[in-house]
Every structure is written in structure tokens, then in C-alpha cells.
Amino acid sequence: MNIILLGPPGAGKGTQATNICNKYSIPQISTGDMLRVAVKVGTPLGIEAKKIMDSGGLVSDNIIINLVKERIQHSDCKNGFLFDGFPRTITQAEALRKDSVKINFVIEIQVPDQEIIARMSGRRTHLKSGRTYHITYNQPKVEGIDDITGEKLVQRSDDSENTVRSRLDIYHNQTQPLVNYYQSWMDKDSNAPKYAAAIGIGTLDEVKDRIYNSLISYD
């Protein structure tokens, strides 16, 4: 089973990706991880990508697509794979299609922006340990204080409301065209990837079940 998983920051995509990968015995593949491994190992594509990154440039879609095609030939992809954060653009999606990289499902975890903002801007962190709390869902025993050390909790800059809103704007600008692309393809071609939206509100198990039901309904 070959899956593309989409979802905004704070939607719980990482947790659900792990659940899907465990259920179907497939690897979770992100372009960031692929780039790091290729650069570390020193593959031809990795060397090429490193030169570009060292000069401050952006790695081209062509290199990314070739890394993806190389990665999915590995033995751990025999049952399929899950793309996390890829494709990001219509160009990348069309390159996958042109190169006949089979995708069975495109699953989008949908969470309203206000819920995402509440989830992320409510986080409070103990910087030394990395322990994370939430002002609503996982409160410390004493407001603003780490349970273990008694030290002050902080809101990381990444979790500020303005930063979260900015990240959501970027996500929507990137993702909505992709969703439209896959929906349009599915409407025209019975062999196209099946697109489904799963509401990402509720318990982790409730969201997991919605995703599994989407996959089963098209199986």
C-alpha cells in the first residue's frame, strides 16, 4: 500500500503516520530524512545535493524525485510506503505521475485552524529536559512550573500564535492545490490515487479509526 499523508502542523500527523506504518508494515519516508542519509552516505545524489545546500541553494525537484525513486526500491518498501511531507508541490506530484510511481491513497488529516492554534500556542516547555505541557490538555501541577525541577516553563517561539498562523498559511498555500490536483485526477481516472479526508479532532484512537476506515472503504 503506497500512501501520501497530508496534514497541517499540530494535526498529529507524526503519530498517525507511525500507526499506519505499523499496521501495514511499511516505512515512513520523508524527503528530509532521505537527504540527510544520502549526504551522510555520500551517494552521487547526496554529493550533488550537498554542493547545492552548502552554497545556500534549494535542492531541485529533479534531485528530490530521483532520491524518492531510489529510496522506494529498497527492500523495506516491498509492502509499500508512506510519504510524509511529500509531494509538496504540483510539480513534484506530476513528476511522480510521469515516472509511474504508483500511489494508492492520499489521506489528508483535517483540523480547523483555530484548533491547531489552540493546540500549539498552548504548549509550554521545560527547555533543559524537553518536557512539554499544555495550558489546557496537560497542565503542570503548578501553573508555569515544571513538575520535576520546579523551574519555569516557557513558550517556544515556534509555538507563538503568530508563528503558528504563518506556518498554517504556508501549509494551506502548498496543500490546497495538491488536494485539488488529486481530487480532479480521481474524478477523471479510476486508476488514480484515492483521496480521502479524515477529521483530526478527537482522541488519537478515534482519528486512527477514521483513517483506517478511509483506507478500508477503498480497499
Swiss-Prot record:
It comes from the Bacteria. Keywords: ATP-binding, Cytoplasm, Kinase, Nucleotide biosynthesis, Nucleotide-binding, Transferase. PROSITE patterns: ADENYLATE_KINASE. ATP binds at residues 10-15, 123, 132-133, 202. Residues 30-59 are annotated as: NMP. The keyword Cytoplasm applies. It is found in: Cytoplasm. The keyword Hydrolase does not apply. Its EC number is 2.7.4.3. HAMAP family: Adenylate_kinase_Adk (MF_00235). Consists of three domains, a large central CORE domain and two small peripheral domains, NMPbind and LID, which undergo movements during catalysis. The LID domain closes over the site of phosphoryl transfer upon ATP binding. Assembling and dissambling the active center during each catalytic cycle provides an effective means to prevent ATP hydrolysis. This is Adenylate kinase. The gene is adk.
